[in-house]
């Protein structure tokens, strides 16, 4: 079998099983698993020579250097199958006795509105209120695969629908193509990075700036500057809770005064899996500008935590309590 045919077969079956990720590992043989509703399921095994060939095929498609076999690398590419285009994000990791590739499958044609993101009714209203702002910094946090990009793209759709705004995005990589947005893909190898690109787009008269991720002090500082100069800035950051987002920004050198001036909202989100109904639930916690200010001033503050969102879902009979047991046990 040709490698393009084998790859198409693997992706076809992954999509059929609604997998979010494809795991491939070569040791004595090639083992392939799909992540379905949070759990890994075995799909197939192949002889080791086929394993090396399909791995090299995937590396080639995703612009991963096949000569650097001992170096972890990432890549990505768009893939057309079954009349749809999917964005495939690839991670290659070498071990002492094995090679591993994980492919994240991102659905380019499935567009969720902010009203469809979560069963938590307060979530859409909170995001809509952020979209109505003309300036400030809004941050979305969560673990890898928690839907941060999905939330930002849904907000972009709402902003596009509102009209009258020049929207520029900086992404690494571009996961979903949006009309009526100027999308710029980061490429460190060619000198295209968040810091330098942010400085450039400020001359492009933007109203809204989406930054794929705040990952270093330079990007954090420029994001603050953009928000201070009258732009609405949306971005993601790695932190597990809303409060840790604030601490993360402080650790990146942002002053409390600047956070008070520009941070208009925080969402931290988790993915929960309802195996009985075979669905994915985005569970958010939401921190408003008022709560952020109270926290920074060491006053009493309150915001919608994961536990409160979980209790809301249970009270409205939208979710069974056993799915949210970890959140319900939070102090």
Cite the ranges covered by each PLM segment.
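Short, flexible helix-loop junctions that flank or precede catalytic/ligand sites
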Residues: 1-331
């Amino acid at each position: 079998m040709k490698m393009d045919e084998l790859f198409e077969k693997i992706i076809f079956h992954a999509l059929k099983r609604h997998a979010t990720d494809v795991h491939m590992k070569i040791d004595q043989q090639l083992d392939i698993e799909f992540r379905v509703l949070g759990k890994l399921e075995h799909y197939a095994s192949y002889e080791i020579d086929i394993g090396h060939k399909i791995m090299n095929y995937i590396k080639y498609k995703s612009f991963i250097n096949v000569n650097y076999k001992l170096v972890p690398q990432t890549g990505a590419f768009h893939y057309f199958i079954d009349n749809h285009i999917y964005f495939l994000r690839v991670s290659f990791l070498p071990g002492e006795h094995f090679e591993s590739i994980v492919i994240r499958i991102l659905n380019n044609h499935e567009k969720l509105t902010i009203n469809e993101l979560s069963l938590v009714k307060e979530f859409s209203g909170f995001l809509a209120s952020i979209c109505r702002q003309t300036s400030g910094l809004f941050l979305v946090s969560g673990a890898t695969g928690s839907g941060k990009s999905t939330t930002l793209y849904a907000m972009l759709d709402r902003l596009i629908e509102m009209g009258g705004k020049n929207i520029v995005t900086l992404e690494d990589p571009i996961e979903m193509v949006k009309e009526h947005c100027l999308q710029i893909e980061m490429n460190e190898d060619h000198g295209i990075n968040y810091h330098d690109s942010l400085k450039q787009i400020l001359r492009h008269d933007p109203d809204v700036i989406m930054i794929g991720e705040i990952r270093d002090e330079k990007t954090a500082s420029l994001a603050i500057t953009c928000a201070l100069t009258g732009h609405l800035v949306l971005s993601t950051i790695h932190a597990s809770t809303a409060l840790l987002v604030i601490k993360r920004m402080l650790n990146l050198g942002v002053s409390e005064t600047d956070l008070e001036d520009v941070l208009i909202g925080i969402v931290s989100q988790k993915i929960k899996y309802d195996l009985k109904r075979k669905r994915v639930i985005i569970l958010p916690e939401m921190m408003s500008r008022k709560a952020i200010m109270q926290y920074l001033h060491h006053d009493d503050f309150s915001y919608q935590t994961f536990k409160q969102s979980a209790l809301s879902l249970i009270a409205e009979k939208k979710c069974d309590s056993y799915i949210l047991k970890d959140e319900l046990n939070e102090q």
